[in-house]
């Protein structure tokens, strides 16, 4: 080996070692696979425990789950790691019908069921010996951002809320994504699906995302790009489908209607500046109806930029600091 090659090899080895040491130092927690029940079904999740929890010590805790059809492997581990490194116990889980959790029909999205799963996750967390049940925060993104708005308004066990790029009014949202002349046909299609399921028991499905011009639940280009890439690289068990009934249930969902009831629980909303999936102006209008204490964070980019790169820093650090401010007093 000539001297130049040898020195390049040494430098590359030193750089790799430094990166590995930084990564190891950054992970000041351990993660455990956990299960708990919700309405008789087993939910599967992760429990993050910060290093240094003393015997008998109880830590503030963050409970979190994903948005429309997504599973925990789709970047929730990055957010949970950030919060755990900040000293929080973190519970991450998949809803009934998704991921490794039980429940039928598969890929069926019912907001009331998912909110119930959140409530049961909070209950389970509060029973763990290292959890302070009086210092529980919740985090949600997109469709689960809607869920945490609802929970924050009605579940007083929750002491802090972070809603990232949340859905605030599904009907208003839907009218932005679907042409007005297509709307009556969509309603007729949903009614026909209900009739078919009622008379035959058949469960019909629709892709979560598809190529432009093809029917899907999330008909934006950035939705297609993110779900297909993230599913392939991080969550091979993710299924690109949801029940047709899921859309009908979503259209009746208006979590922003009660946003004023979240107070006095602290609320942070993280809104993307160029969000075409859960439109920016709808989220900001809802935030305006929330009462103090509250904080608005504007994220550069679109809906899915919150999960990676600089967008992850812009979304996760304010969330961590908000939880610290209100749960680590």
Give the positions of each predicted feature.
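N-terminal cap/lid segment of alpha/beta-hydrolase-fold proteins
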Residues: 26-57, 110
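Conserved alpha/beta-hydrolase "acid-adjacent" motif
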Residues: 276-282
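Alpha/beta-hydrolase-fold enzymes
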Residues: 149-229
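Conserved alpha/beta-hydrolase
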Residues: 82-102
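Catalytic histidine neighborhood in serine/cysteine hydrolases
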Residues: 290-304, 318
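Short beta-strand/loop motif that positions the catalytic acidic residue
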Residues: 262-263, 269-271
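The serine-hydrolase catalytic nucleophile loop
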Residues: 69-81, 95, 281
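Catalytic nucleophile-loop/oxyanion-hole region of alpha/beta-hydrolase
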Residues: 72-75, 98-137, 309-315
